[in-house]
């Protein structure tokens, strides 16, 4: 039937048929949002603003910046690592049109060459952790020893942060290497913080391997796909780990 419809001109190509079939099945009311779902309430005015210099790392195509990290050095040879998560739910009334819409979608749909967001653009603009914006978030703080990287304490806060940098993975991944971190030659923004988090991640890896009794599997490969046009141009890019 598909080949017949394409031959008769009812369907331009197989790509269009598959995409439209997916959306008819999963978005029977359409991909758009109602005006009511797009209305964004004001954020609470009494949230404290954290004194951190946070940064995010995403691909250049990412418009919903939903997480960021920070490293703040304390006295006594300690540092505080912050993991900051965007929190549109903080200002989204339970049972509202926006809430019901988000619950029905559950997630943003990602596919090569297309993306259908879980939230309306107005919500993304208000709550995304964009560079230079002061926005609400949920922060997990981990205080660690600078030398041993041992975790000393943890804390969770609801607050506001201003993200200093939105780093783009595809623009810096060739520069961010273990050798550059170890040699102190990394020159990308937040190089010191990236190096500190790398050391922290290595310490956690060593802990996991000790408990497991065997090395963690490495060498796994990630792929990044870029689709141009109507599916005729596909770039497959190997991502480092």
Task: Name each model-derived stretch.
Residues 33-241:
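Electropositive polyanion-binding surfaces
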